[in-house]
Amino acid sequence: MRSVKRQMIRMVGAALLALASSAAAQPLQRGIETRIVAELNRARADPGAYAAELRRYRTLYRGRIVWTPGNPVGLRTQEGTAAVDEAIRFLAAQAALPPLTDTRLLARAAGDHAADQERSGLQGHGGRDGSSPAERIRRRGGGIYAGTGEVIAYGPTDAASVVRELIIDDGVPDRGHRRLMFSPRFRAAGAACRPHRGWRTVCVMDFSTSPDGR
């Protein structure tokens, strides 16, 4: 319990992803919240296969710009392929993990923070009311006897991009998002996405060490 709390504090202190580009805004993918948890479970179930996908994604880099299909202006990264290469090595050494239960309680807690940032245009894990991820989960009836965690991505409009960028964790020195998502301690997750006036979109994913978020 204490170690999970310490881990969460480290994750909260990690720098946030800067994933927006100057391309025209796109609508959020239909059903993106459940797709995010499913995509993360796919990566957890077979990290080696996901590493192979990242090797193919790596070929889209030109210096620090990623030129994905349909994006004529590219996506600027901080580290270029260095972060991708590190993620590939991490995944190659990572054992398969059981799936996270997609939990409504955690999705609601994530939705509270995403909606707050939609209104405020702010970033980070702290709510405008001073709430932490653990406090928001408790307000929804969870996290009382469990460890909790949270990751946030800004900019992507589809689940695959959200999960991929959090796993690569470009610009985050301690790779806190990646380590949290592959922690064997967590057993449940829930995601929520909303529009964000500064970064197009904000996607929040909350985690719990209990199977139902409680």
List each model region and its residues.
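A well-ordered secondary-structure block
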Residues: 103-212
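Bacterial N-terminal signal peptides that target proteins for export
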Residues: 2-12
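Short, well-ordered surface patches within globular domains
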Residues: 26-142, 178, 184
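Classical secretory targeting signals
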Residues: 16-17
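Intrinsically disordered, low-complexity serine/threonine-rich segments
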Residues: 6, 24-25
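N-terminal signal peptide c-region/cleavage motif recognized by signal peptidases
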Residues: 20-22
